[in-house]
Amino acid sequence: MTMAIEDMFGDLRKIDILAESKAGEVLMVLVCNGFVDGSPETQKALLDKMEGYLNHTLSDEFQAEYPKWPVVLRITFTEEPDQLILDLLYKCQAWVNDYGAALEIEIGRRKIHFVEQG
């Protein structure tokens, strides 16, 4: 049985966590609960939520509060997602960088580092 999109990602229009790190970065955390499957609907929902986060960094309100701050978009999974989701996020790095943000992935509190696929 697959989980509902809202169970995996919460409200797609809401930023789960926005915090200031000790390193002087804006940390935006997107929390994914349970097993995140690789279906097209799930992939689209994840991209939509990520886009909401990234668009928020361009808002006047955000720019006024955090002018020139480095931004980290951290996608955190409570359990290992489908490989299709990891492949998708690998391909999203340049897109996230276009917004001036860095993409981090965490699975069960363990940071995942992408290696170049060649």
Which role does the model predict for each range below?
Residues 1, 15-17, 60-62, 92:
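Intrinsically disordered, low-complexity boundary segments flanking structured domains
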Residues 1-9, 36-47:
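Short charge-dense sequence patches
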Residues 2-21, 106-110, 115-118:
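Aromatic/basic-lined ligand-recognition segments
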Residues 10-13, 21-26, 80-85:
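Amphipathic, soluble alpha/beta structural segments
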Residues 19-21, 64-66, 96:
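Sterically constrained small-residue positions within well-ordered secondary structures
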Residues 24-36, 66-80:
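Short glycine-rich, basic-tinged beta-strand/loop micro-motifs
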Residues 40-64:
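Acidic, aromatic-enriched beta-alpha/helix-loop junctions
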Residues 71-72, 77-118:
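Helix-rich interaction surfaces within compact, conserved domain-sized segments
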